[in-house]
Curated annotation (Swiss-Prot):
Its main location: membrane. Keywords: Heme, Iron, Membrane, Metal-binding, Monooxygenase, Oxidoreductase, Signal-anchor, Transmembrane, Transmembrane helix. Pathway: Secondary metabolite biosynthesis; terpenoid biosynthesis. This is Cytochrome P450 71D178. GO terms for biological process: defense response to insect; response to insect; response to jasmonic acid; response to salicylic acid; response to UV-C; terpenoid biosynthetic process.
């Protein structure tokens, strides 16, 4: 009995301490903080996140409390931005104050202590690696030079689909493999031997790293940090990733040049590593972190967008017919298809825009406010986590007519770009932290999609209708389809 009473006293003392800390933190917050839902003691609004995907839940909050809303997730103060104007102020007007990135357990472990570019803090390391990326690695000129790789791999995929004509195929699996091979050849100069292992590592780590860990939301609690079992699983995956990358990088170092000749991304990074003029030394972990960025952001997101575009076209046969008519008219008789040819495909590019609007590769863009700022009249304290709900902005009825409807024709009336200038459509972000692989990613989406629409007519498996296509999203950083897309290809005969 005495032991039971002692435990009750301890629990009450701990709860009292947490409630007092909560009141102390609340007293320090500015009076003009954005509005938000009523919160519970200790956990704040954490209980609200159990009702669906984060982008959906946060949209529900901002629809009720306004496009700029405050959410308290445990000890962590966060502000959700779900309007074009709020995003414009944070990513353009006040860009330096919102250019930092907060780091959680998953990103710290899998992305090499933020020595990569995606999760790097806003510092000299980030400025240097971004400059290298934009000028040396993924510039439009370099992306264009990778065209022969895209052509090779699409020719292989087309042969595979031709050999399976009339049969139901897991299109999701084959497109993921193809995009992974393209990225592999660009990054490593050759095809990765254990490509399926790397692809599975990327997908699983993205899934695990995208979740909320209690230890992240209660950073002062050593106990929650100790009991964060997902952290130990992530470290296990990190060791597997290290073994894989260390072995491949050593092979690459010995081989000196890629399988296909020329200088690949690793060659450039090794060259920069030896450059004594570098302000911040490039470490081996930095190289591995960047390579992991290329695979995690370049493979999963590009494949997911192609699959969402195909899914939407299959649900809208008239849009599919229009896209195929354009592709087959403009590409007729052309043996090599890459960025120059795709640039002529106005409607196909609108299809991609619309797929990115409805299914952005990163539904929520995380930022960190590093100095007290004012957004749409509300005060955002320093060290507040910012969650820019790109998914919600792309479905805002103030800017989009019938926002939940797939309609590529809408861009004929109001052209919008996707390179960060039009804040109604920011699938790759904007400002200093805009995705540096934007051009590489678009090439790996538009070129394969054009080829698939040119060479094949697509049908659903027997017994399925357009209404049966499952459009459910899966949790993850890239917002992929929950279930694979199964389609039946029929070879298109231009002479028939």
């Amino acid at each position: 009995m005495d032991i039971s009473i002692s435990w009750v006293v301890i629990i009450l003392l701990v709860l009292s301490y947490l409630i007092l800390m909560e009141k102390w933190r609340a007293a320090k917050l500015p009076k003009n903080l954005p509005p938000g839902p009523p919160k519970l003691p200790v956990i704040g609004h954490l209980h609200l996140l159990g009702g669906g995907l984060p982008q959906h839940v946060l949209r529900g909050i901002t629809q009720k409390y306004g496009p700029v809303a405050h959410v308290q997730l445990g000890e962590v103060s966060s502000v959700v931005l779900s309007s074009t104007e709020a995003a414009r102020q944070a990513m353009k007007v006040l860009d330096p104050a919102f250019a930092d990135r907060f780091v959680n357990i998953g990103s710290r472990i899998m992305w090499y202590d933020s020595e990569d570019i995606i999760f790097s803090r806003y510092n000299d390391h980030w400025r240097q690696i971004r400059k290298i990326c934009v000028s040396e690695l993924l510039s439009p000129k370099n992306v264009k030079s990778f065209g022969y790789i895209r052509q090779d791999e699409m020719a292989r995929l087309i042969r595979l689909f031709e050999s399976s004509e009339g049969a139901a195929i897991n299109v999701s699996e084959e497109i993921s493999k193809t995009v992974c091979t393209i990225v592999s050849r660009v990054a490593f100069g050759s095809v990765v031997k254990d490509q399926s292992l790397l692809l599975n590592l990327v997908k699983e780590s993205l899934r695990m790293a995208s979740g909320f860990e209690l230890a992240d939301l209660f950073p002062s609690s050593w106990l929650l940090n100790l009991l964060c079992f997902n952290k130990y699983r992530l470290w296990g995956m990190r060791r597997r990733l290290d073994n894989f990358l260390d072995g491949f990088l050593e092979e690459h170092r010995v081989k000196k040049s890629g399988e296909y000749g020329g200088e690949d991304i690793i060659d450039v990074l090794y060259r920069m590593q030896k450059d004594s003029q570098m302000k911040v030394p490039i470490t081996n972990n930095g190289i591995k972190g960047f390579i992991y960025d290329v695979f995690s952001a370049g493979t999963d997101t590009s494949a997911a967008t192609i699959l969402w575009a195909l899914s939407e076209l299959m649900r809208n046969p008239e849009k599919m017919a229009k896209a195929q008519a354009e592709v087959r008219e403009i590409l007729k008789g052309k043996t090599n298809v890459d960025m120059a040819e795709v640039h002529e495909l106005k409607y196909l590019r609108s299809v991609v825009k619309e797929a990115l609007r409805l299914h952005p590769p990163f539904p929520i863009i995380p930022r960190l406010c590093i100095q007290e700022s004012e957004v749409t009249g509300y005060t955002i304290p320093a060290n507040t986590r910012i969650l820019i709900n790109v998914w919600s902005i792309g479905r805002d009825p103030l800017y989009w007519n019938e926002p939940d409807t797939f309609n590529p024709d809408r861009y004929d009336e109001v052209p919008r770009d996707i390179i960060g200038n039009d804040f109604e459509l920011i699938p790759f972000g904007s400002g200093r932290r805009i995705c540096p692989g934007l051009h590489f990613g678009l090439a790996n989406i538009e070129v394969p999609l054009a080829q698939l629409l040119y060479h094949f007519d697509w049908k659903l498996p027997q017994g399925m209708t357009a209404a049966d296509i499952d459009m459910t999203e899966k949790p993850g950083l890239s917002g992929p389809r929950k279930n694979p897309l199964i389609l039946v290809p029929t070879i298109h005969n231009p002479t028939s």
